[in-house]
């Protein structure tokens, strides 16, 4: 069952189907696909799903995205959990059962294979993805700033 907050912005070409819950100030950008046809997809406040992303679930794995999350252009999230204040880089892929803890960055092009979990505050890069270091306070702050920038951009 769709539950879409009135302050959500869904741009032309984007598709939201199935059991999907979108909280306040979420933005779904051009040509993104959010398919909650197997299990539920929940996207938290102030999060943005950028152009050409694909969000999907499996029959065993729902998809949960926390608050202040930015999902970069053409990223794929499949049956995973993304906690608050995370940046998923462009063309990154996060697969079933994986869990990205809060205040983390998954770098552009990274492949997070099934059932992986990384510590809070990690920089996660590579194929297959691995945590290479902890983020600085400034880097963590930039994740929040980016999400807030997208909220403003979506209202123009």
What are these regions (language model features)?
Residues 1-4, 37-45, 51-53, 62-67, ...:
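Glycine-rich hexapeptide-repeat left-handed beta-helix
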Residues 1-33, 37, 151-156:
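Extended, small-residue-rich solenoid/repeat segments and analogous flexible loops
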